[in-house]
């Protein structure tokens, strides 16, 4: 089975908790950075991570990483990513979110637009078509720039994983399920003990 490099974003400060969760599932850690943990896994790992990781916000398949300081460079290097390996001829694809920190390229809308154009050009040449119906499955792409290093991932989660839960009603200032799970994991609480939340409302 094919092995992917997977990116699991999380709340800042919870990287160690998420790393421990990933190791408990039996996967090899590639890198721990501010706000995300990268690890290796196959297609089954993608499914298991989306279901069982309680502190991850979403799971991305890493499509590529490169340095870009100009929009021309961003276009050309995005075009070099083998998009045909991930997105079929009828796939619906778009850059759903772009974030930039301490980078020369900082306009999210421009980053999204240029990357989409590069993806289209790559897939047009690979599939020998001039128009995409985009009638198939969705392949949302997320991009993050940190100090001019561009990391590109295909989102396998869709809606953020903190919305997986059973919550039927929401109060005015709810704590997300992923953050609540992390807070519990940071305590010495065990499953056989009673848990009381005095601030539950």
Question: Can you annotate each of these PLM segments?
Answer:
Residues 112, 116, 120, 140, ...:
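Hydrophobic, well-ordered secondary-structure segments
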Residues 95, 143, 183:
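A residue-level signal for conserved active-site and pocket-lining positions in enzyme catalytic cores
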Residues 141-154:
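C-terminal edge-of-domain segments
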Residues 2-139:
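Non-catalytic nucleic-acid substrate-recognition regions in nucleic-acid-modifying enzymes
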Residues 83-87, 174, 184-192:
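Glycine-rich helix-loop-beta junction characteristic of Rossmann-like nucleotide cofactor-binding loops
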Residues 191-201:
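Conserved class I S-adenosyl-L-methionine
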Residues 152-186:
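SAM-dependent Rossmann-like transferase core, predominantly class I methyltransferases
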